Amino acid sequence: MEAVLTKLDQEEKRALQDFHRCAWEETKNVINDFLEIPEERCTYKFNPYTKKMELLFTPEFHTAWQEVPECREFILNFLRLISGHRVVLKGPTIVFTKEIKNLGIPSTINVDFQANIENMDDLQKGNLIGKMNIKES
């Protein structure tokens, strides 16, 4: 999966944050119900030891997410929220590309299946600093 990221304005970002607050649990439930497995398939949490936010997926989610529209939408909304950018799908590879290139901000975000997001203060302000790696655990 590849996506193009363009900057969100403040109103769009607030609307997305409101949506994300309301939709987080519901989205997880939809994914879990779709996969018909009673255990939780994804978790979003702050790791106090590494000081990073983590988005964790199980192997079942890993194999299903590209084929399940709810899984794709969940990941896109998550990336929109934490990056403060619009995300537009461009193909089947798992690479996200920033449209605006600034010094200190990476042009590519490699995505697998455990998100370790650096510097939450900057992310909450809509600045993507460092790299988001999602790795299968």
From Swiss-Prot:
Belongs to the asfivirus A137R family. This is Structural protein A137R. Interacts with host TBK1. It comes from the Viruses. Keywords: Host cytoplasm, Late protein, Virion. One of its GO terms (cellular component) is virion component. It is found in: Virion; Host cytoplasm. Induction: Expressed in the late phase of the viral replicative cycle. Its main location: virion. Plays a role in the inhibition of the host innate immune response. Mechanistically, promotes the autophagy-mediated lysosomal degradation of host TBK1 and affects IRF3 nuclear translocation to block type I IFN production.
